[in-house]
């Protein structure tokens, strides 16, 4: 069965385009019906980020869930990992995060979590899609069995305490000047407060959401403002989260970016030395730099690769017993603490290492020299450009040209109509030639569709 709604990270699209109140209501009904298991009164936790359309989607989903007899617990703007944590903590049957993650305000999305706080499997999402295509009128609750909705107070404090508990009790951030960029998103209240409670000297940017400015020239996908602020304030470190705070990028005291691959290297080495790695290796995606793989090999650690998407990283971690994984983009999963990527908790693990070593972030967080990596995107309107013979030929030729001295990855995005072409290797000029040839072939195929 083809997936008409769900991508690699829930349902995502333009607000009042794909993501309409009608769809949100139907998702609430379908997911609510599917997760009403057992005889207890069923509950769902709903959180959101700060984009304007969040109100519209939130109320539509409340209508959907309550119409099938499920109670709704509204927590307001909260990080995605906080919603996952609260779903389990509140003994809910289901969790919902209304967010389009790092996208701009025009988009929105719906992420669903099971009762243990894990994202739903492909099979469960397919079951929801089947229900979305059916008429559910005859499955609605009777009048006396409709669900109730209420807003929950104190959830910010719950997440702050959860995050703080991931650090040793005797470790504080006293003496560290930290600039944090919350992307005008879901973490704008909780993360600065948590850092302050841990003893850091906190300078906050991206903490004035207005419904329109989420991820706009700020956050983990646009860290330039953070880099400038770190240098300006002579800070020790910068933390950039995205709109729903499930990914993080750091900036060292010189204003240089530390991406997800480097963060994985820092945490992996630290945890290995402390005996905290569950297995001698970590899990990352096919997008992680070959430099990370070589660094880990030097540490006696294995890099296990998965398809792109933090859910696939987590699935492999759980299946094979790893407790550290993530993506180059900054999704870092620490399964000892969280059931999904948690940008802030990942940042805290790095801050803990910095505090213990008492060395500058620039020395602690640049563990390897990344191989030159070229990533280009080709947008298309319709069809399947990757099925074109010319594209297949260009990919085959490119792989032969790299000949074991690099990697080539060509894939469709799981969240938008884009073909991503990534190449990396020791010879940057050769990699760029190979990528450009494939981009041209994909572009021609897309234009002919």
Curated annotation (Swiss-Prot):
Mg(2+) binds at residues 101, 242, 244, 246. GO terms for molecular function: magnesium ion binding; phosphoglucosamine mutase activity; phosphomannomutase activity. Pfam families: PGM_PMM_I, PGM_PMM_II, PGM_PMM_III, PGM_PMM_IV. The modification Phosphoserine is found at residue 101. Its EC number is 5.4.2.10. The keyword Metal-binding applies. Binds 1 Mg(2+) ion per subunit. GO terms for cellular component: cytosol. Belongs to the phosphohexose mutase family. PANTHER family: PHOSPHOGLUCOMUTASE (ALPHA-D-GLUCOSE-1,6-BISPHOSPHATE-DEPENDENT), PHOSPHOHEXOSE MUTASE. This is Phosphoglucosamine mutase. The gene is glmM.
């Amino acid at each position: 069965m083809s997936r008409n709604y769900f991508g690699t990270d829930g349902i995502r699209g333009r607000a009042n385009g794909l993501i309409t109140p009608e769809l949100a209501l139907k998702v609430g009904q379908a997911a609510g019906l599917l997760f009403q298991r057992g005889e207890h009164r069923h509950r769902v936790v709903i959180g959101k980020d700060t984009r304007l359309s969040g109100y519209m989607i939130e109320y539509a989903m409340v209508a959907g869930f309550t119409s099938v007899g499920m109670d709704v617990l509204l927590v307001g703007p909260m990080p995605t990992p906080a919603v996952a944590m609260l779903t389990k903590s509140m003994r809910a049957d289901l969790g919902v995060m209304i967010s389009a993650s790092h996208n701009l305000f025009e988009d929105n999305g719906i992420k669903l979590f099971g009762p243990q706080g894990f994202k739903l499997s492909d099979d469960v999402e397919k079951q929801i899609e089947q229900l979305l295509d059916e008429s559910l009128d005859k499955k609605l609750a009777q009048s006396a069995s409709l669900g109730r909705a209420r807003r929950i107070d104190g959830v910010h404090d719950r997440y702050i305490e959860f995050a703080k508990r991931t650090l040793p009790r005797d470790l504080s951030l006293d003496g560290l000047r930290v600039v944090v960029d919350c992307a005008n998103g879901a973490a704008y209240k909780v993360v600065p407060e948590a850092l302050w409670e841990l003893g850091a000297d906190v300078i906050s940017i991206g903490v004035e959401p207005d419904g329109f400015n989420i991820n706009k020239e700020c956050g983990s996908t646009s860290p330039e403002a953070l880099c400038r602020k770190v240098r300006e304030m002579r800070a020790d470190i910068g933390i950039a989260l995205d709109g729903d705070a499930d990914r993080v990028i750091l900036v060292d005291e010189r204003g240089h970016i530390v991406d997800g691959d480097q963060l994985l290297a820092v945490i992996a080495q630290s945890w290995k030395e402390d005996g905290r790695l569950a297995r001698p290796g970590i899990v990352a995606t096919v997008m992680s730099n070959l430099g990370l793989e070589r660094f880990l090999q030097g540490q006696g650690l294995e890099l296990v690769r998965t398809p792109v998407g933090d859910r696939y990283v987590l699935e492999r971690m759980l299946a094979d017993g790893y407790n550290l994984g993530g993506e180059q983009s900054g999704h870092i999963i620490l399964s000892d603490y969280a059931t999904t990527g948690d940008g802030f908790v990942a940042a805290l693990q790095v801050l803990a290492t910095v505090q213990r070593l008492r060395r500058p972030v620039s020395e602690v967080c640049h563990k390897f020299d990344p191989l030159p990596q070229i990533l280009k995107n080709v947008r298309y309107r319709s069809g399947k450009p990757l099925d074109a013979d010319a594209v297949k030929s260009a990919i085959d030729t490119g792989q032969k040209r790299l000949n074991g001295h690099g990697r080539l990855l060509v894939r469709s995005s799981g969240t938008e109509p884009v073909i991503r072409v990534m190449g990396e290797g020791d010879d940057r000029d050769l990699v760029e030639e190979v990528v450009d040839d494939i981009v041209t072939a994909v572009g021609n195929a897309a234009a002919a569709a």
